[in-house]
Amino acid sequence: MARFELQKLYIDGGYVDASNTETFDAINPANGEVLAQIQRAGKEDVERAVVAAEKGQKIWAAMTAVERSRILRRAVDILRERNDELAALETLDTGKAISETRYVDIVTGADVLEYYAGLVPAIEGEQIPLRDSSFVYTRREPLGVVAGIGAWNYPIQIALWKSAPALAAGNAMIFKPSEVTSLTTLKLAEIYTEAGVPNGVFNVLTGSGREVGTWITEHPRIEKVSFTGGTDTGKKVMASASSSSLKEVTMELGGKSPLIVFDDADLDRAADIAMMANFYSSGQVCTNGTRVFVPNALKAEFEAKILERVKRIRAGNPEDENINFGPLVSFEHMESVLGYIAKGKEQGARLLCGGDRLTGGVFDKGAFVAPTVFTDCTDEMTIVREEIFGPVMSILGYDTEEEVVRRANDTDFGLAAGIVTRDLNRAHRVIHLLEAGICWINAWGESAAQMPVGGYKQSGVGRENGISSLAQYTRIKSVQIELGDYASVF
């Protein structure tokens, strides 16, 4: 029997039954427990949500900027009041350690909403003089109804990253969470309504990307789609959104990011950064620095420091405050990660540690994979070229700066990159050469609300967070005023 009651769709300010009777299960990856049955939206439900969103958006956009800002700030307060409840639910649904969800996921999501709530009154047009008798003014107007499609690794945070700028700009949003982790997004919908967001301005449709996601991207009255997920799926979403009605898109896609350790680096700091860039959230972070480049002369020493730190990882029940490494998000994903590990072994990478499923005690019922480190990796190996999205680090040796920059950029992806060095000139010189949208120097992973994030190449289109993201949820209307006489050529 499921722990929670049947989860319905959230449309027009409240929970409603789906148009069909199909459901799917939310599974706790730490022990296989069925958390809830969730209704699967039908095509009719997408239309119902669009109609509700169109109605609510007109009310929302007609409010003053200060009114909208005040309501969103109230939602921030409720998020923070319910932080522990939401974190506990996120941990059950994703398997992420409670030490992450309680102190990072909900907190930083609320920070993003607070950031955009503060920017609402700053949405402005321009006045452009043409001559004494004429000028142009511009208006930044909301797009209307927009859609967000989330990934499974940061469910409520991604929902906030997408909905915060959308709602701040006066839009209504239809959000489809990942089928694997849907529960906290439904709670976010409750919070928006409680805060005073008009009915229909934030709707949640649960179900598969293949069906519900496609119906959303194809809908002619949805003006924009913001998607987070894998590159292959992102290409399909972008093609569907474009071919159906030339929708605007934001794509935050996959990565295979390089972390370059230079020969002057503090190796202890470099090892700490590499650990965070590979094993935080059990390796299920799109920006992970999974290709760790280390000078050949320092590789053995660096490997020893990594092994020392791997021993400090505390894997176990993610509801335990002392744990910092939980299961993967699902048993299906666990098998995918184990498949990549097997390929690493087959293709000649040297296994330093891990390489198997964790077993015994609490691990037997969960989707746990041991923190895994390969070394002596080469650029053509599958584990080096493809996104694994799990706790698998690949260490690669190099000899020169020119060589490592070339190899770091030799990828279809361009989401993130980082370097560790004491040389300030080298730091800026090299970071400017790396083909990636999110870069860190002597750090890894922090992504503040003010920081635009997004990828180069096949890692994405557009940006999330920062002031620029707010503009992407508006369109510009130009208006010319003529105060003088008008001369016709006819």
Swiss-Prot record:
Positions bound to K(+) 1: 27, 93, 180
Superkingdom of origin organism: Bacteria
Residues recorded as bearing Cysteine sulfenic acid (-SOH) in the entry: 286
Reaction(s) this enzyme catalyzes, per UniProt: betaine aldehyde + NAD(+) + H2O = glycine betaine + NADH + 2 H(+)
Known pathway: Amine and polyamine biosynthesis; betaine biosynthesis via choline pathway; betaine from betaine aldehyde: step 1/1
One Pfam family in the UniProt entry: Aldedh
Site entry: Seems to be a necessary countercharge to the potassium cations: 248
Cofactor: K(+)
Membrane spanning stretches: none
Molecular function GO terms recorded: betaine-aldehyde dehydrogenase (NAD+) activity; metal ion binding
Residue numbers binding K(+) 2: 246, 457, 460
Residues the record lists as binding NAD(+): 150-152, 176-179, 230-233, 254, 286, 387
The EC number(s) this enzyme carries: 1.2.1.8
Catalytic-site annotation from UniProt: 162, 252, 286, 464
GO biological process, one term: glycine betaine biosynthetic process from choline
Cofactor binding summary note: Binds 2 potassium ions per subunit.
Listed InterPro entries: Ald_DH/histidinol_DH, Ald_DH_C, Ald_DH_CS_CYS, Ald_DH_CS_GLU, Ald_DH_N, Aldehyde_DH_dom, BADH
PROSITE patterns: ALDEHYDE_DEHYDR_CYS, ALDEHYDE_DEHYDR_GLU
This protein's UniProt keywords: Metal-binding, NAD, NADP, Oxidation, Oxidoreductase, Potassium
Biological role stated in the UniProt entry: Involved in the biosynthesis of the osmoprotectant glycine betaine. Catalyzes the irreversible oxidation of betaine aldehyde to the corresponding acid.
Cross-referenced NCBIfam families: BADH, PRK13252.1
Assembly behavior: Dimer of dimers.
Record-stated family: Belongs to the aldehyde dehydrogenase family.
Protein name per Swiss-Prot or TrEMBL: Betaine aldehyde dehydrogenase
Top-level taxonomy: Bacteria, Pseudomonadati, Pseudomonadota, Gammaproteobacteria, Pseudomonadales
